[in-house]
């Protein structure tokens, strides 16, 4: 292998409703991982400035990054980041969507309704954890994606994320304060804040565990349960429902899909 191939890097970008997750791969190794806020009004120049600063801090040369893959659930930011990479990195991103090979057969009423991030997670799980699998991605929304024993995507569930739930209870009431989402020491809160933290945290665990159990029952077999997303580690502290916690699952899925679509 020549030196150029050995140092070839890939930028994987997962654009979500709350944050933009950016990973830099060298081969299979994730060299760096950053999160930027998802701000539709932010200009491409602003995102480029942030990203170039992070690259400099990590001692990664921008000129090395001409391979880029993205998945997005925020169309305006898709356009913004395409501009970032075309202008500042001279790279045209591969955007996960129609016509892109993922290795995942989708058995849904309308396959086009399935979000790109969910397809990417399924692609990662299919490679990393073959067989029946339930992927629980905990972000702005919490998605439950199910793979059959043969690795086909057969559907799932969508629920509010834990932060979304906490925000809703504040916005829909007049006296309840904003709270930090933590793993409380006990369920019985001794004041308003601790009572809210208990209800949000343990109530959310109940939601996740019940949906996983129902999906397992409908599958008729034990499926591996993989947690990912920004709140995966925090929720896994209070639940034994997960077999694996893999915060970088989406980035890994993007890497696999890029390999499948290389020209």
Curated annotation (Swiss-Prot):
Enzyme class: transferase
UniProt main location, coarse: cytoplasm
Reaction catalysed by this enzyme: (R)-pantothenate + ATP = (R)-4'-phosphopantothenate + ADP + H(+)
Entry superkingdom: Bacteria
Cellular location(s): Cytoplasm
Residues that bind K(+): 137
One GO CC term on file: cytoplasm
Keyword presence, Nucleotide-binding: yes
Cofactors named for this entry: NH4(+); K(+)
Gene3D superfamilies named in the record: 3.30.420.40
InterPro entries to which the protein is assigned, alphabetical: ATPase_NBD (IPR043129), Type_III_PanK (IPR004619)
Binding site for substrate: 115-118, 192
Residues annotated as binding ATP: 14-21, 140
Active site (catalytic residues): 117 (proton acceptor)
Cofactor note as given: A monovalent cation. Ammonium or potassium.
Pathway: Cofactor biosynthesis; coenzyme A biosynthesis; CoA from (R)-pantothenate: step 1/5
GO molecular function: ATP binding; metal ion binding; pantothenate kinase activity
UniProt EC number: 2.7.1.33
A Gene Ontology biological process term: coenzyme A biosynthetic process
Subunit field text: Homodimer.
Family per similarity comment: Belongs to the type III pantothenate kinase family.
Reported function: Catalyzes the phosphorylation of pantothenate (Pan), the first step in CoA biosynthesis.
Protein name: Type III pantothenate kinase
Organism listed in the record: Dehalococcoides mccartyi (strain CBDB1)
